[in-house]
Amino acid sequence: MRMRRSADGWRGLIGSTFTPERAARLAATIVTAVRAHDGGGPRVVVGYDCRRLGRRAARLIVRAASDAGARAVRIVEHLPTPTASYLVGAGDAELALLVTASHNPPEWNGVKAKGRPGCPLDAELERRADALFDDSERAAGDAPFGEPSGEPFDQADEARADAGGLDDAIFEACDASPWIDRHIAHVLSRLPATPDLPLRVVVDGLSGIAGSAMLHLCDALRWSATPLGCAPSADFGGVAPDPSLPASRRRAAEAVCAEHADLGLVVDGDGDRVYAIDSDGRTVEPHELFALLLAHRHRRRYGHPERGVAVTAATGALVQRLCARWSRPVIEQPVGFKHLSPLLVEGRIDAGGGSVGDLAFAEFGVDRDPFGAVALLADLLATSGQSLAALVADLRHRYGRFDWHESHVNGDATDTQLRDAGRRALERCGFDARTARITTVDGIKFSFDSGEWLLLRPSTTEGGIRVYGELLSTRAAGAAAALAAHVARALAAERSP
């Protein structure tokens, strides 16, 4: 078993499918693929977050990258992923290798790769690297010397593992702070002026590595920030580092209300996802935040309004409804920002967004960047004179209120089983499934004229089936949860002999 390719990079369970040695072999294959593609050895930045064995993996990656032909290697502790993308885009490196599992639980770790011009590797390069990784794993055998057995390490074990690995490797150790400062300065420079509206905010870093960077941005905006979970921790303080989970947003929402703050910001473990919370402690869904920022850019004539907008198949339908008013094309892509970045690179779109707080705007770069999104939000609040809560309420009044739902069902299913299970679940909830438009951009998606929709797709990282959808708020209370439950039962029935 090896790390599996995910929506962004490669992920595995620590001590099992993820080991520092395996991460180093993967890094070597990525460098090899990039060398073959570019015709020369890349300059490489190696970053790592606070997860177990991350430092050990990063140190072995430094050696592996050097051995594979990298021209220069720098290692940076706690480098947020959007900052790494910015640095590659700015020409400080041709490749960033980041030891992180992003929003996944603390039992996971992995490797993300960012190439020129500051985004995930293009699809062909990623496939080539993955094929080389397969070859490398077969050559290494099932149990390479020095890899952990899968049993949990204690602190002494981890300290010994972290202590070694670079005695004969040439590298430069760098502090992330100056690069974070450069990134924030770049983001603010892309606005007509730095927004001038002091606010009280709550920032929850979920004990990952991006909370302190978001605090730096708040300082630059003259926002007074209350920090939560802004000190990195290997177990993320017992809270999942995924802001899309309601439980992970709860303490920020409570703090916003207790502190009488204007808004809250919750970022994921490596900083490439952000959720906003309004002054009433209510979550602003990512597609609502995306729509607000798109409308603001449209009014202020920012960006390239002649270009399209891209969303993933799991993104709320509000963005399509909004863009239809402006006659802007919307391109729907599979889940994973690696499917949206190429459209930014090609100039076909000037903004892209997913369903989990992963937003990008062309003025800031070609990869998702919560720092850019928050800077735009600051500009919106300063120029509109309205609160985030008021802006969202107006948006819902004009375009309708939909309840978002997302759930997970264990086990696998074929496309046919997903299609049949979705139809069965929709009919149990009172829909006429025969009237649905079915698309297969990623999994099976049912869309209705009412704006409601249901998507069933296999998870690329943790396995099982992801269930997403939006239902009108006027439906009976609990309708979204009931639909998710019907999907689970229908899938179980489809799998039964």
Regions from the PLM with identified roles:
Residues 46-50, 203-205, 278, 363, ...:
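Short glycine-centered, acidic/aromatic-flanked micro-motifs in structured strand/loop junctions
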Residues 76-78, 127, 131-146, 150, ...:
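Proline/glycine-rich low-complexity loops and linkers
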